[in-house]
Amino acid sequence: MKIGVLALQGDFDAHRQVLERLGADVVMVRKPEQLREIEGLVIPGGESSTFLKLLGDAGFEELRKFVTTKPSFGTCAGAIMLAKQVENPAQKGTGALDIRVRRNAYGRQIESAILTSECSLPGGEMEMVYIRAPRIEEVGPGVEVLAKRDGHPVLVRQGKVLAATFHPELTGDTRVHELFLKMVRNGNSGEK
């Protein structure tokens, strides 16, 4: 199974390491044509506005086509990229996930934290690393909330798309990546 990791900036290498440990064949995606080689895509954390600049209009359109039709997983800035609506400030998202997100809602870099929250994935509680994280302000009717922090969704799934506002790749817990690989294998939303 070939999984792409968008490797333009951000913490893409941490995702590569987790995915390879779980047995995936990982392609570091740096050009739009590489999207044709993969079955699923991870959009890592980083800076969402920088992703937009580095992708350009043509690259963004290729990314949008991929994430709206194939299994995709975004963390932090990747979740912003997958969103239907982005605010603080407003910017475009791919619309692959029916969510409204607020960028940098949990504060500045210095306010980053490692917290534990309840999660509906097998195994219960999950350690979650937040770094200038976005907050999911609203979810559409087809979005399943898998975990919350202070009443706000932090891990959501809709069809073939999975998003986390935290960084599961920075902990030893591989459950979120395992769920994504299961979604890719099943070609759909998978099972918890």
UniProtKB/Swiss-Prot annotation:
Record key words, sorted: Glutamine amidotransferase, Hydrolase, Lyase, Pyridoxal phosphate
PROSITE patterns the record matches: PDXT_SNO_1 (PS01236), PDXT_SNO_2 (PS51130)
Keyword Ribosomal protein: no
Pathway participation: Cofactor biosynthesis; pyridoxal 5'-phosphate biosynthesis
Domain of life the protein comes from: Bacteria
Taxonomy of the source species: Bacteria, Pseudomonadati, Acidobacteriota, Terriglobia, Terriglobales
Protein's recorded name: Pyridoxal 5'-phosphate synthase subunit PdxT
Complexes and interactors: In the presence of PdxS, forms a dodecamer of heterodimers. Only shows activity in the heterodimer.
Positions that bind L-glutamine: 46-48, 103, 131-132
Catalytic residues identified in the record: 76, 167, 169
Catalyzed reactions: aldehydo-D-ribose 5-phosphate + D-glyceraldehyde 3-phosphate + L-glutamine = pyridoxal 5'-phosphate + L-glutamate + phosphate + 3 H2O + H(+); L-glutamine + H2O = L-glutamate + NH4(+)
MF annotations from Gene Ontology: glutaminase activity; pyridoxal 5'-phosphate synthase (glutamine hydrolysing) activity
PANTHER family: PYRIDOXAL 5'-PHOSPHATE SYNTHASE SUBUNIT SNO (PTHR31559), PYRIDOXAL 5'-PHOSPHATE SYNTHASE SUBUNIT SNO1-RELATED (PTHR31559:SF0)
GO cellular component: cytosol; glutaminase complex
Similarity comment text for this entry: Belongs to the glutaminase PdxT/SNO family.
GO biological process: glutamine catabolic process; pyridoxal phosphate biosynthetic process; pyridoxine metabolic process
Function: Catalyzes the hydrolysis of glutamine to glutamate and ammonia as part of the biosynthesis of pyridoxal 5'-phosphate. The resulting ammonia molecule is channeled to the active site of PdxS.
EC id: 4.3.3.6, 3.5.1.2
Pfam families hit by this protein: SNO
Matches recorded under NCBIfam families: PLP_synth_Pdx2
